[in-house]
């Protein structure tokens, strides 16, 4: 798309917008199937859509949001297969799951257990080899294609030192704490130990509810098609176990919050299915459970509402304002050479992308310093973009603040003349 239409901000976000529509489409279908009760359906939908951290990724030009949408679409197609036993739905489920991995390779942790469980379900529906092969052949051939396509990228990834060294998260609980911290934006709802308390509550709920689902699965003849909700519940613990095995076997660290993003939809499905089973067993008493979670979700999303920046890419908030300011400076001063700009190292990638790719031609007005890691602010460029005044204090004798970015601590400095 970028090759045809250029690297316009809307164009580079089209895949993730598709992911957002897929996510919403699949979420609506899955929640309608979970329960006959309207309020339970609405509750389940809010659990899938009410995480502000997850929602951010449907506006960022990254693969995480697209992967989440494809994953939920795969789960919806697997539900359809469990209900109808049609080979087309099984093949579609594997296609969506395979594409989810291509959007974000972390979803291999979803893909592997999903394929295993959906093929077990296919065998349960078609317990003779001839019937199983007839129903599963298109899906299995599709699976082989994806395995072949994924082999070389995975081989290359194994050579990347970041796979071994990035984040250094040494425990699964630590990984979950990072995810919870990202989801609540460090709001101390329960005091200083909010993150730890909420993480324990989430872990205990998921473990306990998985045990309940396992009991129900056993009572219903160990068949997923007896209640497709069992399949939805099983995916989260299966993915977590896969993650633990991967860490143990490969020595890689546990997942940082954005890499673990795909856990949130799976957790949301567990919360929704729990409400459906609770209502089924106890009727309106389920409102106690739903009211608490709905209240917290509404409170959290209202506290974390975010229309101006990304919590993951917080340093990108003022990029366009700085570029527009420098463009205006170039034009009003009648310059013929691009303006020299240096910046804190975390901001460099965003500027370099816009200068190299943005079709609006900012490279005519601005020349960026070569990429560098963390280093003290230098005096080599006419303009310096700092994260805060504290960072720039050692060069303030030679620079003036010409643009404080509203709503942030970022400042653009210019050499005194």
Features from the language model and the residues they span:
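Short, solvent-exposed mixed-charge patches
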Residues: 416-417
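Membrane-proximal helix-loop-helix interfaces that form the catalytic/acceptor-binding platform
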Residues: 1-392, 398-413
């Amino acid at each position: 798309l970028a090759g045809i239409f250029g690297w316009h901000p809307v164009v580079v976000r089209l895949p993730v917008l598709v992911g957002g529509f897929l996510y919403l489409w699949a979420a609506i279908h899955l929640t309608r199937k979970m329960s006959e009760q309207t309020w339970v359906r609405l509750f389940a939908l809010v659990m899938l859509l009410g995480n502000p951290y997850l929602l951010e990724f449907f506006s960022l030009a990254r693969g995480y949001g697209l992967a989440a949408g494809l994953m939920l679409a795969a789960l919806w197609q697997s539900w359809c297969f469990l209900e109808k036993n049609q080979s087309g739905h099984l093949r579609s489920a594997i296609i969506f799951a395979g594409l989810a991995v291509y959007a974000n390779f972390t979803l291999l942790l979803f893909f592997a257990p999903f394929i295993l469980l959906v093929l077990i379900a296919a065998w349960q529906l078609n317990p003779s080899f001839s019937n199983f092969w007839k129903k599963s052949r298109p899906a299995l051939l599709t699976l082989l294609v994806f395995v072949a396509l994924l082999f070389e990228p995975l081989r290359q990834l194994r050579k990347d030192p970041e796979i071994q060294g990035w984040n250094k998260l040494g425990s699964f609980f630590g990984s979950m704490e990072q995810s919870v911290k990202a989801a609540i934006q460090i709001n101390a709802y329960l005091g200083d130990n909010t993150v730890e308390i909420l993480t324990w509550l989430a872990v205990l709920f998921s473990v306990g509810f998985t045990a309940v689902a396992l009991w129900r699965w056993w009572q219903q003849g160990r068949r997923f098609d007896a209640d497709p909700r069992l399949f939805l519940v099983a995916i989260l613990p299966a993915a977590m176990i896969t993650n633990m095995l991967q860490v143990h076997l490969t020595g890689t660290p546990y997942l940082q919050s954005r890499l673990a993003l795909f856990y949130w939809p799976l957790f949301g499905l567990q919360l929704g299915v729990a409400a459906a089973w609770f209502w089924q067993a106890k009727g309106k008493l389920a409102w106690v459970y739903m009211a608490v979670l709905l209240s917290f979700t509404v409170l959290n999303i209202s506290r974390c509402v975010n229309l101006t920046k990304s919590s993951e890419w917080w340093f990108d908030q003022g990029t366009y304002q700085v570029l527009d300011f420098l463009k205006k400076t170039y034009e009003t001063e009648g310059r013929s050479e691009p303006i020299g700009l240096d910046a804190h190292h975390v901001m460099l990638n965003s500027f370099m992308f816009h200068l190299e790719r943005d079709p609006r031609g900012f490279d005519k007005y601005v020349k960026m310093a070569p990429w560098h890691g963390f280093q003290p602010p230098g005096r080599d460029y006419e303009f310096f973009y700092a994260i805060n005044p504290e960072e720039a204090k050692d060069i303030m004798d030679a620079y003036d603040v010409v643009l404080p970015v509203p709503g942030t601590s970022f400042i653009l400095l210019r050499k005194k003349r």
